[in-house]
A protein has these predicted regions:
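Charge-rich, intrinsically disordered N-terminal extensions
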Residues: 1-144
Length: 144
């Protein structure tokens, strides 16, 4: 068998495996934009958020983290997406920013935005840990 054919089929199997793992972790990922929706155009923005988050979710899966850790990161990413939509409605100026720019402005080396309605300090700290990880991942992607 030709080498390029072998790598192509291996890559396809790997992609299918990653897609299946992502489906197990986030069976409702396609519905996240609807769960965040306040206005009609929020679904499109939500889909953009999902496209930004998917590579990070795949990276988390490649790290072979414990199921509870993966679930926690997944839940925090869902919260972050909802917070992005909420903030766009609270501050119309944010609607002018591309979604990735807005996301990168909300997260930083220290963590993520304060969630509203308020969550406990320990919940916010856990959320911040996910945001720090996402921040590092997105910044590394910019330097590649």
């Amino acid at each position: 068998m030709h080498w390029s054919m072998m790598t192509s089929s291996t890559s396809t199997c790997q992609d299918n495996g990653e897609s299946a793992a992502l489906e197990r972790l986030c069976p409702d990922l396609a519905n996240w934009p609807l769960s965040w929706q306040v206005a009609k155009d929020d679904v499109i923005i939500g889909q953009c958020i999902i496209e930004i988050l998917k590579p990070f979710l795949h990276e988390l899966l490649r790290q072979h983290l414990a199921d509870r850790t993966l679930d926690r990161h997944r839940d925090h990413l869902w919260m972050l997406g909802g917070e992005i939509i909420r903030r766009r409605h609270d501050d119309p100026e944010l609607c002018k920013q591309p979604v990735k720019t807005l996301l990168l402005n909300l997260i930083e080396e220290e963590g993520g935005p304060l969630i509203w309605p308020r969550i406990s300090e320990s919940q916010q700290n856990a959320f911040d840990a996910t945001c720090r990880k996402l921040y590092r991942f997105l910044r590394q992607g910019e330097t590649r």
